[in-house]
């Protein structure tokens, strides 16, 4: 099973994935956790470039870097893990690119979606389920403000992050069979309980 966790800045994806992984391991599942950009040596190298506020990368170059990292990530880590029977949980995937670069970033939702869905061939490589940790942009940014160092996207203005939130919710509305929206203001364990019910329904 391939699980993706999406959400805006400060939604608590890292804590959610850690807690969800722990519960699934306790149920006897083998879990591989990963993230984007990252998840492989190429992805980790690209991550540094993409998140560095000092790097002045054009929007189209940024998009192509995300896609290059994802193509390698899928082939090198995700597909082998799935073929070996493991459950993969990824912190971000296609829809983060569609929302951040396509919708909030202005490159166009359909244009970016088409590129994402053909990153490893003619057939889209999609997750079995997506958990969207939904949080108001202002609340998420307040959480992030407690950190000492913010990356390029975390430093963007609130209007950008509001567009990100609206973009994710719009995608979730279009694909209710794959998307499950969770309230990121709830305690993490409460969200994990809801997620486990959805995962068990798919098994």
Swiss-Prot record:
SUPFAM superfamilies: P-loop containing nucleoside triphosphate hydrolases (SSF52540). It comes from the Bacteria. GO terms for molecular function: ATP binding; dTMP kinase activity. Keywords: ATP-binding, Kinase, Nucleotide biosynthesis, Nucleotide-binding, Transferase. One of its GO terms (biological process) is dTDP biosynthetic process. One of its GO terms (cellular component) is cytosol. Its EC number is 2.7.4.9. It catalyses: dTMP + ATP = dTDP + ADP. ATP binds at residues 7-14. The keyword ATP-binding applies. CDD domains: TMPK (cd01672). PROSITE patterns: THYMIDYLATE_KINASE. InterPro entries: P-loop_NTPase, Thymidylate_kin-like_dom, Thymidylate_kin_CS, Thymidylate_kinase. It is an enzyme of class 2 (transferase). Phosphorylation of dTMP to form dTDP in both de novo and salvage pathways of dTTP synthesis. Belongs to the thymidylate kinase family. This is Thymidylate kinase. It comes from Chlamydia trachomatis serovar L2 (strain ATCC VR-902B / DSM 19102 / 434/Bu).
């Amino acid at each position: 099973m391939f699980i993706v966790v999406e959400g805006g800045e400060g939604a608590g994806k890292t804590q959610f994935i850690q807690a969800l992984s722990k519960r699934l391991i306790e149920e006897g599942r083998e879990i591989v956790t990963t993230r984007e950009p990252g998840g492989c040596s190429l992805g980790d190298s690209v991550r540094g470039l993409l998140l560095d506020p000092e790097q002045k990368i054009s929007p189209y170059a940024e998009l192509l870097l995300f896609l290059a990292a994802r193509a390698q990530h899928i082939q090198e880590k995700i597909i082998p893990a799935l073929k070996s029977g493991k459950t993969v949980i990824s912190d971000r995937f296609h829809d983060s690119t569609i929302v951040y670069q396509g919708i909030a970033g202005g490159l166009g939702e359909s244009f970016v979606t088409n590129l994402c869905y053909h990153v490893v061939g003619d057939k889209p490589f999609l997750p079995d389920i997506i958990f969207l940790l939904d949080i108001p942009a202002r609340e998420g940014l307040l959480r992030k403000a407690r950190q000492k160092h913010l990356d390029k996207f975390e430093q963007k203005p609130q209007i950008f992050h509001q567009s990100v939130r609206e973009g994710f919710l719009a995608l979730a509305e279009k694909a209710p069979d794959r998307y499950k929206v969770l309230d990121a203001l709830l305690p993490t364990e409460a969200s994990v309980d809801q997620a486990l019910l959805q995962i068990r329904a798919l098994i």
